[in-house]
Amino acid sequence: MLIGKYFKKIKPDFRSHYFSGICFNSKLCEKNHIFFAIKGNEINGNNYIKHAISKGAKTIVYNKKFQGFKNGILYLSFNNVRKILAETSYKIFFPKIKNLIAVTGTNGKSSICNFYYQILNLNKKKVASLGTLGLKTVFGNLQMLNTT
């Protein structure tokens, strides 16, 4: 993943920097991860930056002044590291749905939804259907109450 896709307010020079995951516990850092050094009430994540780097972190998000590359590590400075972690996590793990089809009307909604589901599924698209008949995915069907 390229860091520029997830961090909009950084210098253009940093946008093509690669990362493979995120962590805020230095023990869980792996190669090419971003380490978020969060300052808490009792523990300061800045004290674990060296450990995160030794585990493979290539990017450090912290609240100190320096921003840039140092010894092959990219340091990004933000006032609220906890907020940046939340925003980045959301962008990585909950990307926006690219396409959403809604069917409204008096009659035939379930049939139309089923037709769309079949057409999209046959065309190798990621698809799910939620309606009166429940939740339908490639993994199976699930009966649901109160879908309308």
Describe each model-derived feature in a short phrase.
Residues 1-87:
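N-terminal leader/targeting and accessory segments in enzymes
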Residues 4, 83-148:
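Phosphate-binding loop of NTP-binding sites
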